[in-house]
Curated annotation (Swiss-Prot):
GO terms for cellular component: plasma membrane-derived thylakoid membrane. This is Cytochrome c biogenesis protein CcsB. Belongs to the Ccs1/CcsB family. Keywords: Cytochrome c-type biogenesis, Membrane, Thylakoid, Transmembrane, Transmembrane helix. The chain crosses the membrane at residues 14-34, 72-92, 162-182. One of its GO terms (biological process) is cytochrome complex assembly. The lineage of its organism: Bacteria, Bacillati, Cyanobacteriota, Cyanophyceae, Synechococcales. Required during biogenesis of c-type cytochromes (cytochrome c6 and cytochrome f) at the step of heme attachment. InterPro entries: Cyt_c_bgen_Ccs1/CcsB/ResB (IPR023494), ResB-like_domain (IPR007816). It comes from the Bacteria.
Length: 430
C-alpha cells in the first residue's frame, strides 16, 4: 500500500506534469514539421536522400509513427498520463484544499492570531461594539462573516479555490475530446468541378448526404493573385426533395449535422477547346510539378499517329494557355474565349477552362467536448485569479484593544495595505 501511495504521489507530482506538457508540446511541433497522413512511399522516397534533421530517414519516421503523430500510440499514452496526473492532483490536493477552505476556523485567543501572516492590534472601546461594527462593515463589503461572542471570522473570494480544479477538469475534457476526434473522426479531401457530386456514406454503406458543387469562383487581386475562393453547394439528404443551398469560402466553413466542409484548395479540372471545325472537346488537365507548383496542362498530338505533340500549360482559369513543342519552344499563347491560333497547321481555339474546388470534409465527434473543456478551462483560470482572503478578530475588553489577523493566498502585500483602511472604516479611532 505504501508503494502504491508513493506511485500515486509521483504520478501526480507537479514537476512530472510540467515535463509531460513540454514533451507533448515537442511532439506537437514534430507533427507540424513533418507532413502527416501521407502515403508510406512518400516518406521513404522523400526522406531517403535528404533525411530530416540530417539523420531521420523515412524508415525511422514510419517506425516512430511520426507520419501520424497525433494518433500514434505513444502520443495517446502521453495524453492519458497527463490526464491521469491531473485527475490525481485534483483528487489528492485540490479537493482536500477546497474542503479545508470551506470549513470555518474559529480562533479564540489573541496569541493564535499573532502567528498569522498579517497580525495587528488596534485600540477599541471596552465593550464588544467594535466586533459588531466590523462584522457589519465586512458584510457591506461582500464578506462572509461568522460571528461569535467577542470574536468573528470572515472570508471573501472562496470561490477562487475552485479555479484549479476547474482548470484540471477542463484540460482533461479537452484532451478526451481531442483523442475522441482523432480516433473516431473522419477526414476527406476532394476536388470537385462544377456540376459534379459527392455521395457521403454512413457506416452501413448507405448514402446519408449528397453534396453537389453548382458553382466555383476565384476572386483575384489586380495582379492576378487569388484572394478568395467561393463554392456554391447543394446538400440533399435521403428522402428530401429539395436541396439546401450553402456557400463555403476561405475562413467561412459550412457546418451541417456534425459535418464541417472547409474551402481548402483549388485546381484546374478541364479545358474546353476546338480544333479547326471540330466539336468542342473538354479534356482533363493534370498537374506538372516539374514546371512549377501550380501548373496544369495536357499533351496534345498534332498528327493522327500521335507524333509531334505539343504541350498546353496554364496557371489560372483566366489563362493564358501557353503552347510549347517538344523542344520547349513556345508556339502560341491563347486566351479562354479568345481568337483562334494556328499551331503546326491546326487551328486551336480555347473555349474555357473549368476550375475545381478543393473541399476538406471533416467529421469530428470530439469538437463539442473540446469546446466545453476549453470553456471550463477559461472559467477555472479566471476563478483562479480571485484572491481568497480570510480575516479573524478577537476582542480584548480588559486591555481595550482588538486583535486582528489575516491570510491571503494571492497578493498578501495588497491585503496588508488594505487592512488598516478596512479597520479604520469599521472601528474609527478616537
Amino acid at each position: 500500500m505504501a508503494t502504491f501511495k508513493r506511485l500515486l504521489a509521483w504520478i501526480s507530482d507537479l514537476r512530472i506534469a510540467i515535463g509531460l506538457l513540454l514533451v507533448i508540446a515537442l511532439a506537437s511541433a514534430l507533427g507540424t514539421a513533418i507532413p502527416q497522413g501521407e502515403l508510406r512511399e512518400s516518406y521513404l522516397e522523400g526522406y531517403s536522400d535528404k533525411p530530416w534533421l540530417g539523420f531521420v530517414n523515412g524508415s525511422m519516421i514510419l517506425r516512430l509513427q511520426l507520419d501520424h503523430v497525433y494518433t500514434s500510440s505513444w502520443f495517446l499514452a502521453l495524453l492519458a498520463w497527463l490526464g491521469l496526473a491531473l485527475i490525481l492532483c485534483s483528487w489528492r490536493r485540490q479537493w482536500p484544499a477546497l474542503q479545508a477552505a470551506l470549513q470555518w476556523i474559529d480562533y479564540q485567543e489573541p496569541r493564535q492570531l499573532s502567528k498569522l501572516a498579517i497580525a495587528e492590534t488596534i485600540s477599541s472601546p471596552p465593550k464588544n461594539e467594535s466586533i459588531d461594527k466590523l462584522a457589519a462593515h465586512l458584510h457591506q463589503q461582500g464578506w462572509q462573516v461568522q460571528q461569535q461572542p467577542g470574536r468573528l471570522a470572515a472570508r471573501r473570494g472562496i470561490i477562487g479555490r475552485a479555479g484549479p480544479m476547474l482548470v484540471h477538469l477542463g484540460l482533461v475534457l479537452l484532451m478526451l475530446g481531442a483523442v475522441w476526434g482523432s480516433l473516431g473522426g473522419n477526414r476527406l479531401e476532394q476536388f470537385l468541378a462544377p456540376g459534379r457530386s459527392l455521395d457521403l456514406l454512413n457506416r452501413d454503406g448507405n448514402s446519408h448526404l449528397k453534396l453537389t458543387l453548382t458553382n466555383f469562383g476565384i476572386e483575384r487581386d489586380p495582379a492576378g493573385r487569388p484572394e478568395q475562393f467561393r463554392s456554391q453547394l447543394e446538400l440533399l439528404e435521403p428522402g428530401q426533395d429539395t436541396a439546401k443551398l450553402h456557400e463555403v469560402s476561405v475562413n467561412h466553413p459550412l457546418r451541417f449535422h456534425g459535418l464541417t466542409v472547409y474551402q481548402a484548395d483549388w485546381s484546374l479540372a478541364a479545358i474546353t477547346l476546338q480544333l479547326g471545325r471540330s466539336p468542342q472537346l473538354q479534356l482533363p488537365l493534370r498537374t506538372f510539378p516539374e514546371l512549377g507548383e501550380q501548373v496544369w496542362g495536357l499533351v496534345l498530338p498534332t498528327n493522327p499517329d500521335g507524333s509531334e505533340p505539343v504541350l498546353l500549360s496554364l496557371t489560372s482559369e483566366a489563362g493564358p494557355v501557353q503552347v510549347f513543342d517538344a523542344t520547349g519552344e513556345r508556339l502560341a499563347s491563347l486566351r479562354p474565349a479568345g481568337p483562334t491560333a494556328e499551331v503546326k497547321g491546326i487551328p486551336i481555339r480555347i473555349v474555357d477552362v473549368l476550375p475545381a474546388s478543393g473541399l476538406l470534409l471533416k467529421r469530428d465527434p470530439g469538437v463539442p467536448l473540446v469546446y466545453i473543456g476549453f470553456l471550463i478551462t477559461l472559467v477555472g483560470g479566471g476563478l483562479s485569479m480571485i484572491a481568497t482572503r480570510q480575516l479573524w478578530a478577537v476582542g480584548d475588553p480588559e486591555n481595550e484593544c482588538l486583535h486582528v489577523g489575516g491570510l491571503c493566498n494571492r497578493n498578501l502585500t495588497g491585503f496588508a495595505n488594505e487592512l488598516p483602511s478596512l479597520l479604520a472604516a469599521a472601528v474609527p479611532q478616537q
